[in-house]
């Protein structure tokens, strides 16, 4: 599930201007490219505040639980929303911006990933951080690659569903990842004061 958030973060700038602002490959030309840029920029504003919010939430409620339920599933909803909102509601900037909030919160909910890798390999933290950087780079590459390879065969909707399925699979994968997080047991449950004593 490493850095799955990068799939849409780097894949959507490839396909969404075509989908939302042209009629190519089944696009609907609902918005101008400048409007898409505003939607996408708004999503990045949300991630700035989301990074701070989720950093605190992850420390309080568990890194993996946060990424599993909020990171992966908000990204599923936000990804599919970017495709289906124009299909059903046309050029509705309010709904698209609301979806950008969901997607931005989902992407930023992966913020504990930088702590998870070193926690999984506490004896090899340098190598763990290198592996994290490699995973980030690969998903930065695979997001646009998925879009480029699949768009001509399964269209914009198919690409969005592919991303969404990857997020759903990532959610399942997190069930088998158990980093040591201070204040939590190996299953990701908070250790109470009574249990510590």
Annotate each predicted stretch with a short phrase.
Residues 73-90:
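C-terminal ends and interior cores of transmembrane alpha-helices
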């Amino acid at each position: 599930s490493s850095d799955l958030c990068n799939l849409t973060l780097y894949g959507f700038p490839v396909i969404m201007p075509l989908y939302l602002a042209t009629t190519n490959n089944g696009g609907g030309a609902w918005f101008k490219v400048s409007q898409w840029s505003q939607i996408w920029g708004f999503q990045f504003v949300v991630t700035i505040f989301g990074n701070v919010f989720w950093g605190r939430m992850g420390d309080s409620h568990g890194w993996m639980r946060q990424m599993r339920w909020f990171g992966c599933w908000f990204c599923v909803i936000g990804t599919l929303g970017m495709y289906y909102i124009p299909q059903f509601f046309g050029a509705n900037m309010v709904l698209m911006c609301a979806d950008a909030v969901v997607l931005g919160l989902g992407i930023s909910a992966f913020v504990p990933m930088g702590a998870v890798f070193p926690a999984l390999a506490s004896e090899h933290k340098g190598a763990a951080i290198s592996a994290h950087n490699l995973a980030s780079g690969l998903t930065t590459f695979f997001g646009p690659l998925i879009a480029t390879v699949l768009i001509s065969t399964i269209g914009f909707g198919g690409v969005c569903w592919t991303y969404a399925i990857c997020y759903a699979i990532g959610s399942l994968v997190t069930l088998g990842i158990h980093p040591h997080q201070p204040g939590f047991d190996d299953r990701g449950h908070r250790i109470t004061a009574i249990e510590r004593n």
